[in-house]
């Protein structure tokens, strides 16, 4: 009887994990599509790039709101508001590249982002490896990136920019590995929080690859 209860408990846990993973990827797909549409509208209307204060207020304000509402239906609306805002911020950035005939860099960054995401997801889902050991590395990288961004305000150096962008690529890649593993091992049971976490990693990854490819192309 006891072994049967344990087996039923494991089956229930496995079903819940699959449900969270399925819902996460479904919502992630919807938010990526929505963000792309908003970015396209932002580009078409030539909307200005938000200033630093608006960017920080919008990002962290909507992020906090989404996490606060993640256990309710309003969390989904907040998720779309958050990802839509990030889509809006992408519009002016992409316009700069397109207007300078650098659309190929945008495509390359997009392809690189997709490749990293699918490779990381496939690796974790195939191996079922527990990536919780990455948490310390991710935190350390966050501190280094924070210091690097502060330094970039005082030192205008292409090498510093490319170093920060390179670290962001590593940081975002590890974030995808960690969050995917966290879902399949039951560490994250809320698909809204999981979606936002992966979305932010993809956003940072895309922007970082754009910066790297742009700097490298200018040096040629």
From Swiss-Prot:
Keywords for this protein: Cell membrane, Membrane, Transmembrane, Transmembrane helix
Chief site of localization: membrane
A matching Pfam family: Bax1-I
Entry's localization field: Cell membrane
Transmembrane segments: 25-45, 50-70, 74-94, 105-125, 135-155, 158-178, 196-216
Keyword Ribonucleoprotein: no
GO cellular component, one term: plasma membrane
UniProt key word Transmembrane: yes
Bilayer topology term: Multi-pass membrane protein
Protein family: Belongs to the BI1 family.
Protein name, as recorded: Uncharacterized protein PM0402
Species: Pasteurella multocida (strain Pm70)
Native organism taxonomy: Bacteria, Pseudomonadati, Pseudomonadota, Gammaproteobacteria, Pasteurellales
């Amino acid at each position: 009887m006891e072994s049967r209860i344990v087996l039923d408990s494991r089956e229930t846990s496995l079903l819940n994990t699959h449900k969270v993973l399925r819902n996460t990827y479904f919502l992630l797909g919807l938010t990526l599509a929505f963000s792309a549409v908003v970015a396209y509208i932002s580009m078409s209307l030539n909307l200005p790039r938000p200033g630093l204060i608006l960017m920080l207020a919008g990002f962290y304000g909507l992020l906090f709101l989404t996490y606060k509402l993640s256990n309710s239906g309003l969390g989904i609306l907040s998720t779309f508001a958050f990802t839509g805002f990030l889509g809006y911020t992408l519009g002016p950035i992409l316009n700069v590249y397109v207007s300078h005939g650098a659309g190929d860099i945008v495509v390359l960054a997009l392809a690189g982002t997709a490749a990293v995401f699918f490779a990381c997801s496939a690796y974790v889902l195939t191996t079922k490896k527990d990536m919780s050991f990455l948490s310390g590395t991710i935190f350390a990288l966050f501190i280094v990136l924070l210091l690097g961004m502060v330094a970039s305000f005082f030192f205008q150096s292409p090498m510093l920019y490319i170093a920060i962008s390179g670290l962001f690529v590593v940081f975002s890649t590890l974030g995808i590995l960690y969050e995917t593993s966290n879902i399949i091992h039951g560490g994250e049971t809320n698909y809204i929080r999981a979606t936002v976490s992966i979305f932010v990693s993809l956003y940072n990854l895309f922007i970082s690859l754009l910066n790297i490819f742009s700097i490298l192309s200018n040096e040629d």
